[in-house]
Amino acid sequence: LNDYTWSAPNRRYLHHGIYLPGRQEQRIPQLAVAVDCSGSVDDAALSLFCEELSSILAAYETELVVIFHDSRVQAVQTFRRQDLPLHLRPVGGGGTDFKPVGRWLDDNGLRPACLLWFTDLECSSFPDEPACPLLWAVWGQGGERPPFGELLRLPAGA
């Protein structure tokens, strides 16, 4: 992502005959966000996930497709910046299976810029590796390391 553009020059210096690039807002076309709503993910973790999603929308002009799942896809919500503050409606509470999210993305033809997965990793049923970059944002210390994607440990109790 580039913070500057020549298509809209910086007007501050134009009267001096100096042409500098203007700032442009960072834009990501679409982000898919999988939220693990299984029984092992508590309200504190879901609250932290919501805060992180709000921060993403505040920083980037994007569309978030939020996929709530436990052992299956339970619900999907779509958000944009104008939807802040976010009101997530997580549904779930059963066991955990990551594979249905991958199938849902394929079945619905979503090709997001990246996939962000909020989870406690208390599951070993991983989907096929997606075509887009994947970041596992993990609450707590549980679970095995995913076979692909980047891993980010979120601070518990934050």
Which sequence ranges carry the predicted segments?
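Acidic, polar low-complexity linker/tail segments
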Residues: 1-32, 41-44
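Intrinsic-disorder/low-complexity coil detector
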Residues: 8, 84, 89, 111, ...
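Short, solvent-exposed polar/charged micro-motifs at secondary-structure junctions
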Residues: 15-18, 75-78, 126, 146
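Von Willebrand factor
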Residues: 25-83, 88-91, 100-119, 123, ...
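VWA/integrin I-like adhesion module and closely mimicked acidic/polar interface patches used
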Residues: 65, 122-158
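Conserved blade-ending motifs and adjacent loop-strand segments that build the rim/top face
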Residues: 95-96
